[in-house]
From Swiss-Prot:
Protein name: DNA-directed RNA polymerase subunit beta
GO CC terms of this entry: DNA-directed RNA polymerase complex
Lineage: superkingdom: Bacteria
The reaction(s) this protein catalyses: RNA(n) + a ribonucleoside 5'-triphosphate = RNA(n+1) + diphosphate
Enzyme class: transferase
EC number in record: 2.7.7.6
Purpose of the protein: DNA-dependent RNA polymerase catalyzes the transcription of DNA into RNA using the four ribonucleoside triphosphates as substrates.
Subunit record text: The RNAP catalytic core consists of 2 alpha, 1 beta, 1 beta' and 1 omega subunit. When a sigma factor is associated with the core the holoenzyme is formed, which can initiate transcription.
Originating species: Coxiella burnetii (strain CbuG_Q212) (Coxiella burnetii (strain Q212))
Family annotation (HAMAP family): RNApol_bact_RpoB
Length: 1375
């Protein structure tokens, strides 16, 4: 990736755009330890892992496509005699037929064919038992459909539109323990539950009921006692009790009961008897509660036997089954309560000892024992049958069916998988050391879950926090695509199994067994219509980047809006540095859709992690470490702005830090890590808001969301007050053109840049590299905004790898430029800025400051109809000459034509069925042989409300259909463009080749050659200059080594020409071949209109701080308030919009912007006075010295570069004030002072209409304003007559349908209240759905008679019909 590597340059060299215009950085922190990472990494990396495209088959890791194949293959037939194995796969042998741009134009998917190597092994059926003999092996490559490829900028082109697959934040697989917060039962008792969530397979839930019995649910079905599942696993009652309880051992004789005492277990009980030490001293009196102090005394006294009365045993539970040794009969079952009768029996059979369960209310409850009493099953088979009945109600259970069902639920890798993540989380939660293991559950797993759940109920351990980012993980494109692919493969598997079992499998090849349809269908469905595969937001570069970095909790396997509560949407402690707390949509999705923080990334398990600097013994090191939310909790982490001395030691005695999710103060020696950067916690969009720290969170949220809606203006202007992120965003978004290799600019024009690459960058010495960059010109984005690139370099400029060569939409010299810097005044102005309205100066319209270009695409399709083919032609019936004036002879509009609403863009006629002809028509036909009446006009016209210029026409013709003139013309133009590129490349390479040759030949001794070159003469430059260059190869030299080099050069020369010809042929074939259009389509014509939208009242504008408003009016320049020096302001905002909204950032931005502009003005004045480079350098130095850190090195620039820099600073010196580390009040005042402006930031203003001074001084300055994509032109709509709904005959609604305005229920009430009967009648009949009345009305008006006679509204007839359909006869009485 060009962009990915663009940062790896050492910072010593200053990039080309920075030399042209550098920012003064007002951040306080020393140089950033970690450069902002490549912003699209999540998407690109994830998809790269999925495809593993350029990795050899044997070296591929176990994820993505490879993993999906391995999990499904090998497929064995039911008999086991035939096996289909997977060997490896390859993606797209030759480079894909069309590149990204062509796919967009032709409406295709940018994809590569997937070919899979498969091996069919057939075993010999006649082989002796136990020995498998291979009879036959066949290997073949099988085509498995197309896999979409990702573009360089992390989007996918599906059916010609750019889409983005948004990452999903879902609950990680593993085991979770929670309680119901006391909501289930009226007593408010906490009911604990455990849930095992697999990556795929059945969910397993354990839960307590209000009586403290344990139950299990499988897949949220009816609950069963939890011990049923333990029995199904093969445990009996005794083993189950043994797993959950310790036992107390009692010795029985005929009179007494003696307990083997373990003192700890007495805690909290009532002493039944007095407990005395050896000397007879009483430690605990009878009927006293035994406390911890008593227990210490008992332990000290070393009492280990205790005689107890019989009734102490009553109610205790037997732990092990007691059998009569003589007869072998069972006297007492395990889990049976002891009664007086049972004790009598025991004594009668001379049982010497018994074990009871140690159950204690404080630390060991009777839950499992109680549950066993509820459990009606007694052995494994009964338990399995019980589970089968729940899972498959109504089916008769058999032993085999019950066993296989239970086996498949949790223990078969096909049906159940925890995945590596799930296993890691599971083992961690149940307290095991090793983090790997089987993907399926084991007996021990289920028992461990129950054990932890019982412990939590007993008060040991805590429940989990679902919203903790250690329990939620990111699923990116690659992983989701892999899952879909696997689903497709599983569908294929069933079919393959059936085919493998056929008798004639020996004659089949792998290709005959595998049907690729289900796989490609699954992939197509995912990329085309999944909830997370979204139409890319392409308003501006920022909205693209943000869309690709979005994280959604919605989507398949996620939450739904309706069910998501407040907790999920809230900002969680673990979001710090991982997910932005600010940027999220307003409305029903708030908090469910988030944005990744600037430095965040997903680790191998899919958990988000964020970088920290290591702190060792109070010293901050430059080493960074990424920590996930789980690991972070155990460390003390200091903030990024903690005070540090020169050596990196922490200075303060108490340091504010985070520990276990809480903010605390602690001593420096405890600190383990420190934040990398102050902007670590916010997302890209929020990091672009200067003085974010002074804005209220709600407004910052609006600010970051509105920046994404800014429309690219014609003349982008970078913000005077930025944050230093602007360059990063512009480069990473991929809208700019970036140098792939360093070199010198060979030629530049508006649509391409040719770079002669530096020698050191090319692999081959002879070969000189040429990079040709074709720029995108006036193309339509997904949001109909305009994508246009223009070069910023000049011929002869030296560029480094990674430098910006051309600006794209909304970028200015390689920096993001979403809006314009305007001179703003905060004051009321005649009520025109009431309620956030905005007042602007006519100057903004004149200077085209907010003029934007929108590109509309119109498509005309000619199809084959039943009555014959439609035809695209300029011969259209009943259309005047004037309407056809803008079309060419093929019936398609000229490029450059200006068209208005209703104009014809493409003339098209459709055959209509034979109709009964009137006598006149028959006559006409007889005379003229006129066929005008059997076609109707179905031309493509411009939709209402649009005027624009035609900028491009594209024509796609079906294979085998004759191409019209226009198509051939377009193809010719395209081909000449390609030819020009190839010729330029050839020219540059040949020049370099001959340059090398000249060095080789000059001064050598010749052995003969053209132009009568005598043997033994020395070759001179002048001789070579007179000789045509092709003839140089005919020179014969005496030096053998040199001759060899000459021959090699000749070969190379021929090779270059051949390569050019081959490429040209390839392009010609690609251009002239017909498109594979949809069935029944003959021709498609796409016309692109450019619409220029100037700013006007009703358009929505906003600043970067959530200060939005609608333009109320545009005031002439002479009426605007003006400053003392006569400068009129550009825009007037209402000061009341600031205090209640608490976005003070805009005021600070205004002050700093004014200072920046003032400094620029001073530099401009110096240039006008003719200052030289030395003076300019001297005056620029104090400005750039304001940077405490990351100081721009003026010394590195040469004099011409200094002059160029100064010229670019005339409009204002750009300043960066990073988020949470911005300029202070003192610095702003200092800058204002340097610019000779009042340090208060306020100035006296004069009224433009009267010339009088306003009473108070007004806050004036430069603010960066954006024009948002909510334009009044797109919203305003009017209709006189138009289309009607079929059934009700009422006008349609909405702008898209060219509908009318609804006159609703409440409006009817209003007219009724006025008693305006006639108006009301008109509204409800002729203006709505009285069909007959409408036509009569029209007739009357034509006749000059303005009366109205209303008829029957159609909706009344619909009502009558509906009542009749209920078998009620209803009709109107005729008077």
């Amino acid at each position: 990736m060009a962009q990915a590597n663009s940062r790896s340059r050492n910072s010593a060299t200053i990039s080309y755009p920075e030399k042209r215009r550098a920012r003064v950085n007002l951040g306080k922190r020393e140089v950033e330890i970690l450069k902002t990472p490549y912003l699209l990494e999540t998407q690109i990396e994830s998809y790269r892992k999925f495809l593993q495209k350029d990795i050899a088959a044997e070296k591929r890791e176990d994820n993505g496509l490879h993993a999906a194949f391995k999990s499904v293959f090998p497929i064995t037939s039911y008999s086991g005699y035939a096996v289909l194995e997977y060997v490896g796969y390859s993606l797209g042998g030759e480079s894909t037929l069309f590149d990204v741009e062509e796919c967009k134009l032709r409406g295709l998917t940018y994809a590569a064919p997937l070919k899979v190597n498969m091996r069919l092994v057939i075993y010999d059926k006649e082989a002796p038992a136990g020995k498998k003999a291979i009879k036959d092996i066949k290997e073949q490559e099988v085509y498995m459909g197309e896999i979409p490829l990702m573009t360089e900028t992390g989007s996918l082109v599906i059916n010609g539109t750019e889409r983005v697959v948004v990452s999903q934040l879902h609950r990680s697989p593993g085991v979770f323990f929670e309680h119901d917060k006391g909501k289930t039962h009226s007593s408010g008792k906490l009911l604990y539950s455990a849930r095992v969530i697999p990556y795929r397979g059945s969910w397993l839930d354990f839960e307590f009921d209000p009586k403290d019995c344990l139950f299990v649910r499988i897949d949220r079905r009816r609950k069963l006692p939890a011990t049923v599942i333990l029995r199904a696993l093969g445990y009996d009652t005794e083993q189950i009790l043994d797993m959950f309880y310790k036992t107390n051992h009692f010795h029985l004789n005929q009179e007494t009961v003696t307990l083997d005492l373990i003192p700890q277990r007495l805690r909290g009980e009532l002493a039944v008897v007095e407990i005395k030490d050896k000397k007879g001293k009483v430690i605990v009196e009878a009927n006293r509660r035994i406390s911890a102090r008593h227990i210490r005394l008992i332990e000290k006294a070393e009492i280990n036997k205790l005689e107890l009365p019989d009734d102490y045993l009553y109610g205790k539970v037997i732990g092990k089954t007691i059998i009569d040794k003589e007869t072998g009969e069972i006297i007492a079952h395990a889990n049976e309560e002891i009664t007086a009768e049972l004790l009598k029996n025991l004594r009668a059979t001379k049982t010497a000892s018994l074990d009871t369960l140690y159950i204690n209310e404080i630390e060991c409850g009777p839950y499992v024992s109680d549950t066993l009493r509820l459990d009606t099953t007694t052995n494994q088979l009964e338990a399995l049958v019980e589970i089968y009945r729940i899972m498959r109600p109504g089916e008769p259970p058999t032993k085999e069916a019950a066993e296989s069902l239970f086996e498949n639920l949790f223990f078969s890798p096909e049906r159940y998988s925890l995945s590596a993540v799930g296993r890691m989380k599971f083992n961690r939660r149940v307290g095991r050391k090793e983090l790997t293991g089987l993907d399926v559950l084991s007996k021990e797993d289920i028992v461990d879950v129950l054990r932890v759940l019982v412990d939590i109920r007993d008060g040991k351990g805590d429940v989990d926090d679902i919203d903790h980012l250690g329990n939620r993980r990111i699923r990116s494109v690659g992983e989701m695509a892999e899952n879909q692919f696997r689903v497709g493969l599983v569908r294929v598997e069933r079919a393959v199994k059936d085919r493998l079992s056929l008798a004639d499998v020996e004659n089949l090849m792998p290709q005959d067994l595998v049907n690729a349809k289900p796989v490609s269908a699954a992939i197509k469905e995912f990329f085309g219509s999944s909830q997370l595969s979204q139409f890319m937001d392409q308003n501006n570069p920022l909205s693209e980047i943000t869309h690709k970095r979005r994280v959604s909790a919605l989507g398949p396997g996620g939450l739904t809006r309706e069910r998501a509560g407040f907790e999920v949407r809230d900002v969680h402690v673990t979001h710090y540095g991982r997910v932005c707390p600010i940027e999220t949509p307003e409305g029903p999705n708030i908090g469910l859709i988030n944005s990744l923080a600037v430095f965040a990334r997903a680790n191998e398990y899919g958990f988000l992690e964020t970088p920290y600097r290591k702190v060792v013994d109070r010293v901050v090191t430059d080493e960074t470490e990424y920590l996930s939310a789980i690991e972070e909790g155990d460390y003390y982490i200091a903030q990024a702005n903690t005070n540090v001395d020169e050596k990196g030691r922490l200075v303060d005695d108490l340091i504010s830090c985070r520990y276990k999710g809480e903010f605390t103060l602690t001593t420096p020696d405890k600190i383990n890590y420190m934040d990398v950067s102050p902007r670590q916690i916010v997302s890209v969009a929020a990091a672009l808001i200067p003085f974010l720290e002074h804005d209220d969170a709600n407004r910052a949220l609006m600010g970051s969301n509105m920046q994404r809606q800014a429309v690219p203006t014609i003349r982008p202007e970078t913000p005077l007050v930025g944050t230093g992120m602007e360059r990063t965003v512009a480069v990473d978004s991929g809208v700019t053109v970036i140098a792939k290799r360093s070199g010198v600019i060979d030629s530049v024009d508006a649509s391409r840049i040719v770079v002669r690459v530096d020698r050191k960058e090319t692999e081959d010495d002879d070969d000189i590299g040429v990079d040709i960059y074709n720029l995108t010109k006036f193309t339509r984005s997904n949001q109909n905004t305009c994508i246009n690139q223009h070069p910023i370099v000049e011929v002869g400029d030296k560029v480094q790898k990674g430098d910006v060569l051309a600006d794209g939409p909304s970028t200015d010299i390689g920096e993001l430029a979403l809006g314009q810097n305007l001179l703003v005044a905060f004051m009321p102005w005649n009520g025109y800025n009431f309620e956030d309205s905005i007042l602007i100066s006519e100057r903004l319209v004149e200077e085209d400051r907010f003029t934007t270009i929108h590109i509309q695409e119109f498509t005309c399709v000619a199809r084959d109809t039943k009555l014959g083919p439609e035809e695209i032609t300029s011969d259209i019936p009943n259309v005047g000459e004037s309407a056809l004036a803008k079309l060419d002879e093929s019936g398609i509009v000229h490029i450059g034509a200006e068209v208005n609403a209703g104009d014809i863009l493409v003339g098209k006629v459709t055959p209509k069925g034979e109709t009964q002809l009137t006598p006149e028509e028959k006559l006409l036909r007889a005379i003229f042989g006129e066929k005008a009446s059997d076609v109707k006009d179905t031309s493509l016209r411009v939709t209402p409300g649009i005027t624009g210029t035609v900028i491009d026409v594209r024509i796609f013709t079906r294979e085998g259909v004759k191409k019209d003139e226009r198509t051939l013309e377009i193809e010719k133009a395209e081909l000449s463009k390609v030819e020009k590129d190839l010729n330029d490349e050839l020219r540059v390479r040949e020049d370099a080749l001959f340059e090398n040759l000249e060095k080789l030949l000059t001064g050598r001794v010749a052995a003969g050659g053209p132009n009568k070159l005598a043997k033994g003469t020395k070759i001179t430059k002048s001789y070579l200059a007179d000789l045509p260059r092709q003839k140089w190869f005919e020179i014969r030299l005496q030096d053998d080594a040199a001759t060899k080099r000459l021959e090699a050069s000749h070969e190379h020369f021929k090779e270059l020409r051949e390569t050019r010809d081959a490429k040209l042929k390839d392009s010609r074939q690609k251009l002239t071949q017909g498109g594979d259009l949809a069935p029944g389509v003959i021709k498609i014509v796409k016309v692109y209109l450019a619409v220029k939208r100037r700013i006007q009242p009703g358009d929505k504008m906003a600043g970067r701080h959530g200060n939005k408003g609608v333009i109320s009016t545009i005031v002439p320049i002479e009426d605007m308030p003006y400053l003392e020096d006569g400068t009129p302001v550009d825009i007037v905002l209402n000061p009341l919009g600031v205090p209640s909204r608490m976005n003070i950032g805009q005021v600070l931005e205004t002050h700093l912007g004014w200072a920046a502009k003032g400094l620029g003005k001073k530099i401009g004045e110096m240039i006008e006075k003719g200052a030289d480079a030395k003076e300019l350098r001297k005056s620029l130095k104090p400005i750039y010295d304001l940077s405490k850190t990351q100081r721009f090195d003026l010394e590195a620039l040469e004099d011409p570069e200094i002059v160029m820099l100064a010229k670019n600073l005339r409009k204002g010196v750009p300043i960066s004030s990073p988020v949470f580390d911005g300029a202070t009040e003192e610095e702003i005042k200092q800058l204002l002072k340097m610019a000779d402006l009042p340090t208060s930031g306020q100035a006296a203003l004069y009224d433009g209409r009267t010339g009088k001074k306003f009473d108070r001084s007004v806050t004036v300055g430069y603010m960066y304003m954006l024009k948002l994509n909510h334009l009044v032109d797109d919203k305003m709509h009017a209709r006189s007559t138009g289309s009607y709904s079929l059934v009700t005959q009422q006008p349609l609604g909405g702008k898209a349908q060219f509908g009318g305005q609804r006159f609703g229920e409440m409006e009817v009430w209003a007219l009724e209240a006025y008693g305006a009967a006639y108006t009301l009648q008109e509204m409800l009949t002729v203006k709505s759905d009285d069909v007959a009345g409408r036509t009569r009305m029209y007739k009357n008006i034509v006749d000059g008679d303005h009366r109205m006679d209303a008829g029957m509204p159609e909706s009344f007839n619909v009502l009558v019909k509906e009542i009749r359909s209920l078998a009620i006869d209803i009709g109107l009485e005729n008077d």
